[in-house]
């Protein structure tokens, strides 16, 4: 078709469809008058998207936490899910909220896909209908399963789909209901969520980076050198036990974010900016896209078993190192695969075609955090 009649409120976004004339309509009577020639309606001017705005949040503003920033750079470069564990005030939320500032800009296809989902929920800006910035969604821990994964008598997308092509941030992870967390497992694995009703089913995309943050215990100070934590080991285990093994298996990287000491807080040396980190992330993503071209996969975190075998071969030293970690950490097969994917990303950031022992060692480090152990 060449002409599209749409509600005036949706006319600007409709012009994103190429080679279609969009007529904005406010009522049926107005449409009838237009079709009869009595009162023609002018076509909606085509909306041209501007360049994405500069990120408001920047890693330059975060003091210290060099290791955490490195881990988030690796996560961004490969699209890996990550869990940050640390005491209150250590910067977990600050670090997480700045992650979109180092992610690659969305392609037009990605922007259109995100825009479609946000349009369903009425979240678009009428003056700027194309979503050009990767979403960052941070639902409260009281959210329901339907609110998180989607639902309703007329199926609507949940937060996991509203975060599609962006970041879903779950702060205070153990405070989420267990069944709510478990409901995310399949959408995380499949990159899509299907909502079934008697009248049929609807599938929404859920291609996200999952970023989670939590305290190491209920009071928040377990393992801190200050000795402020008075939680029993049983209480710590119960707190950590709120996160199931299968859920942890879907998180590629687990890192500690310790409290800053006085010297770090007083440090005035400028931190690296998000723009500088983003350049390295984009270079690594370009390598992955070239390697995986034509496969339907665009980043290391989404590699399938056959691609793992093809692109994540290890030398003898690297294989020996990984076997030692596998035995000592009692890793699952899924955890083993995730270490390989993270190691592949670290090698890409390093500009290396081969995964070396140092890449494996760093990837193991991101998997070796023992929940509930000092």
Residues covered by each model-derived region:
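Peripheral, non-AAA+ core regions of ATP-driven protein-machinery
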Residues: 1-83, 90, 196, 335-336, ...
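Short, well-ordered beta-strand core segments
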Residues: 4, 168, 252-255
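Conserved alpha-helical scaffold flanking the Walker A/P-loop in AAA+ ATPase domains
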Residues: 73, 129-130, 134-135, 146-168, ...
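Conserved inter-motif catalytic segment of the P-loop NTP-binding fold
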Residues: 110-144, 151-152, 258, 298-306, ...
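Walker B catalytic acidic pair
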Residues: 165, 171-172, 183
């Amino acid at each position: 078709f060449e002409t599209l009649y749409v509600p005036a409120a949706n006319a600007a976004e409709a012009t994103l469809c190429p080679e279609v004339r969009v007529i904005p309509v406010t009522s049926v009577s107005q449409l009838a008058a237009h079709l009869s020639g009595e009162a023609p309606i002018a076509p909606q001017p085509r909306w041209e998207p501007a360049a994405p705005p500069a990120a408001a949040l920047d890693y330059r503003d975060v003091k210290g936490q060099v290791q955490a920033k490195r881990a988030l750079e690796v996560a961004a470069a490969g699209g890996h899910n990550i869990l940050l564990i640390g005491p209150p005030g250590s910067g977990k939320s600050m670090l997480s909220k700045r992650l979109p500032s180092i992610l690659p800009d969305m392609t037009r296809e990605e922007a259109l896909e995100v825009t479609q989902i946000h349009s369903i929920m009425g979240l678009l800006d009428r003056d700027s209908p194309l979503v050009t910035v990767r979403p960052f969604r941070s639902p409260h821990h009281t959210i329901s399963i339907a609110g998180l994964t989607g639902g309703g008598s007329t199926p609507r997308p949940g937060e996991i789909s509203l975060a599609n092509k962006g970041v879903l941030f779950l702060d205070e992870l153990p405070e989420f209901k267990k069944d709510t967390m478990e409901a995310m497992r399949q959408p995380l694995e499949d990159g899509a969520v299907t909502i079934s009703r008697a009248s049929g089913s609807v599938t929404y995309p859920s291609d996200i980076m999952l970023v989670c943050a939590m305290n190491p215990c209920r009071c928040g100070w377990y393992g801190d050198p200050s000795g402020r934590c008075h939680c029993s080991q049983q209480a710590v285990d119960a707190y950590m036990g709120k996160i199931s093994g299968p859920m942890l298996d879907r998180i590629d990287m687990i890192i500690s974010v310790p409290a800053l000491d006085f010297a770090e807080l007083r440090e005035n040396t400028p931190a690296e900016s998000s723009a500088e980190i983003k350049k390295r992330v984009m270079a690594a993503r370009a390598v992955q896209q070239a390697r995986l071209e034509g496969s339907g996969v665009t980043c290391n975190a989404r590699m399938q078993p056959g691609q793992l075998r093809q692109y994540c071969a290890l030398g003898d030293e690297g294989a020996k190192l990984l076997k030692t970690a596998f035995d000592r950490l009692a890793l699952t097969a899924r955890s083993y695969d995730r270490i390989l994917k993270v190691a592949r990303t670290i090698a890409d950031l390093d500009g290396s075609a081969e995964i070396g022992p140092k890449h494996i060692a760093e990837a193991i480090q991101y998997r070796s955090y023992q929940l509930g152990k000092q």
